[in-house]
Curated annotation (Swiss-Prot):
One of its GO terms (biological process) is positive regulation of canonical NF-kappaB signal transduction. GO terms for cellular component: plasma membrane. Induction: Cell surface expression is increased by Thioglycollate in elicited macrophages. It comes from Mus musculus (Mouse). It comes from the Eukaryota. Expressed in liver, spleen, lung, kidney, lymph nodes and adipose tissue (at protein level). Expressed by macrophages. Belongs to the TMEM106 family. It is found in: Cell membrane. Signal peptide: none annotated. Activates macrophages and polarizes them into M1-like macrophages through the activation of the MAPK and NF-kappaB signaling pathway. Upon activation, up-regulates the expression of CD80, CD86, CD69 and MHC II on macrophages, and induces the release of pro-inflammatory cytokines such as TNF, IL1B, IL6, CCL2 and nitric oxide. May play a role in inhibition of proliferation and migration. It is a single-pass membrane protein. Keywords: Cell membrane, Immunity, Innate immunity, Membrane, Transmembrane, Transmembrane helix. This is Transmembrane protein 106A.
């Protein structure tokens, strides 16, 4: 009789759970099974929520699983390798567009910042004044330069250097600092004056003898302009030959030439 009672008692003890019932733990176990399964949400193991616990949505089990909020920062969600969230959409398209935009910006930068030629064209003699002193000719000439900027950015003319030659001899020089701004794809006309002193005796006779009808002398004007753009200086040479009436003063206004094509 005693053995039967003890066996009955041991069977009842075996049927009892070792740990007390805990709805929160049951929900965790259900969520664990739902996480490792690739079946739809309705195949997850059912569980009963604890009244005192709040739950948040778990990203596994197609977003239908729930975990206790107090363990939100402790549990790790397992996502299958074939999940669409691990495969970004249109990656190749985004990479192609990024490369294309970078190439376009680079090409436009090179196109607009690539240095283009700056043309300096002597227009000619604008005016001249002549005086005679002690067997020499004092000649002041005003010449005009046309400057064409073919770049897509402004330039600044900072210095002018010019000299006047007569019969291979330097008779006049000028050096001046400037601050002439020329806009993109624009042109400007710049006058400059050079004082020359001719000591040649034959030239003095040509300019002063009244019996000579033509009182023209040939002057060779050579010079250079210093331009600055994008913090880069550049020298632009120019040269012209001018016939000047050394008998009397003259004035020949020159208009700005059209920009060359």
């Amino acid at each position: 009789m005693g053995k039967a009672v003890s066996q009955l008692t041991s069977r009842k003890d075996e049927d009892k759970p070792i740990l007390p019932d805990n709805p929160a733990m049951a929900s965790q176990a259900a969520n664990y099974f739902s996480t490792g399964s690739s079946k739809p949400a309705h195949s997850c193991m059912p569980y009963e929520k604890a009244a005192s616990s709040s739950f948040v949505t778990c990203p596994t089990c197609q977003g239908n699983g729930e975990i206790p909020q107090e363990q939100e920062k402790q549990l790790v969600a397992l996502i299958p390798y074939g999940d669409q969230r691990l495969k970004p959409r249109r990656t190749k398209l985004f990479v192609f567009l990024s490369v294309a935009i970078c190439l376009l910006i680079f090409s436009l930068t090179i196109f607009f910042l690539y240095p283009r030629p700056i043309a300096v064209r002597p227009v000619g003699l604008n005016s001249s004044t002549v005086t005679f002193e002690d067997a020499h000719v004092q000649l002041n000439t005003t010449n005009v330069l046309n400057i064409f900027n073919s770049n897509f950015y402004p330039i600044t003319v900072t210095q002018l250097t010019a000299e006047v030659l007569h019969q291979a001899s330097v008779v006049g020089q000028v050096t001046s600092s400037l601050r002439l701004h020329i806009g993109p794809l624009a042109s400007e006309q710049m006058p400059y004056e050079v004082a020359s002193r001719i000591l040649d005796e034959n030239t003095y006779k040509i300019c002063t003898w009244p019996k000579i009808r033509v009182h023209h002398i040939l002057l060779n004007i050579q010079g250079s302009l210093t331009c600055s753009f994008l913090s880069h200086p550049q020298q632009l040479p120019f040269e012209s030959f001018e016939y000047v009436d050394c008998r009397e003063n003259m004035s020949l206004p020159h208009l700005e030439l059209p920009r060359p094509a």
